[in-house]
Amino acid sequence: MEKYRAYETLKKLAFERVSGTDKELEAAHLLVKECQAMGVEAHIESFEIPAPEITKVSLTLTSPVEKSFYCTGQGRSGQTPEEGIEAPFQYIYNGEDEYIGNVQGKIVMTTGSMTQDLRKKLIDRGALGYIVTWGGYYDDEIMQTQVPHRFTRPAKDDNSNFPGVMMNLNTAKKLLQEKPENVKMVLRQNNDTKGESRNVVAEIKGYEKPEEVVVFSAHYDSVEFSQGAWDNGSGSVTIMEICHYFAENPPKRTVRFVWCGSEEIGLMGSWAYCKQHTEELKNIILNINFDMTGVLMAKNMVFGSCDKGIIDYAAFKGKLHGIHFDSKMGYMPSDCTSFALNDVPAMSFGTDSPRGGAEIHSRRDTMDVMDKDELETIVNFCCAFASDVVNAVINPIPSEIPEDITKTKEDTKKKFGLY
């Protein structure tokens, strides 16, 4: 294995790669080129994504003073009349029941998530619109205007009109400090526009058990305003190095590599892959996902939607390599969950930074937070772990996902809007 190759590849990939954009396509072609350079064929698989077009958005405090606050529109949430809606304002904290009993005819703000359940409760109680937040309390003026354009994932049967906007948490703080009485929201959009995103897929056939497949996945898209070096250029180059490893050391089992597009808008690339390859899923013995590796000053994590013995083994092998892993069982918000929801045992490696450490989903996610030695260490470990699974004498992976995980399957689908 070529030392620091992963870090050098990451430098080439560290640019904004938003779902459905030309830059995401540029990154996809870069990944294909990297595979082909090592003699592994790769191809792009396209899929459709929602791409709601926001044509007008604003949020204005009208009483007790008049002041505008920067925001972006929530795609697919709904829309106001052309002239907007003016209504009393209410802050509902994280949307707990204690705070939403008297929201009729109001525009509400939550610093929690606008879940499908909360959306329904607010609509049923007569709320007219909502504000959600993004970013941090201490973000500077630049960050306060770098609010991404996100869209909601309403429930499958939800055709309601409930317009929403998003603002930076610091901006929201300033709004609350004005003791708002009434606000005016304007949101106009076209909900029906579609876009195109892509997965990149490569494969090396196994020489002994080609019918048994291990899939390595990582999303390669980023959010707006971010180079996405940590999230998730790092995971993308990790599986590229695993691909290098098996190109140089032919595997007993087939290894497949899926660089997923559009993870940042709801696991859409991995979900599309599973739906486009339904018949092939039965041959996948394990999905190993990588989301955020090799950052400076962070703890290593391993997550499992699979038999706990696999996760315990990963943690044990980490000890042999002098690496500690915190572990957790269940569905996690990354592409491994798409596989697990389609009954493929799945796991994911990642890192978590301390409070005040490296950030994701902002302009601060750059190469400055990455460390070539940290990345090299985790890449070498992951290649060794991958080899253990791929080259095992017998398939070591139980095919059943434990019931204490699958009991939350439908709720997880609902959470991510995966149908």
Range-by-range predicted roles:
Residues 71, 75-97, 148-229, 244, ...:
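Soluble metallo-hydrolase cores and metallopeptidase-like ectodomains found primarily
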Residues 2-22, 32-42, 107-112, 129, ...:
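Catalytic-core environment of secreted peptidases
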Residues 14-22, 32, 108-113, 160-162, ...:
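Second-shell loop/turn segments in exported
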Residues 260-359:
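Metal-dependent peptidase/peptidase-like ectodomains
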Residues 69-156, 161, 325:
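Extracellular/luminal Protease-associated
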Residues 244, 356-419:
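His/Asp/Glu-rich mid-to-C-terminal helical/loop segments that flank catalytic regions of hydrolases
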Residues 1-23, 38, 45-47, 140-143, ...:
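N-terminal capping segment at the start of a domain
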Residues 3, 8-107:
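Noncatalytic luminal/extracellular "stalk/propeptide" segments of secretory-pathway proteins
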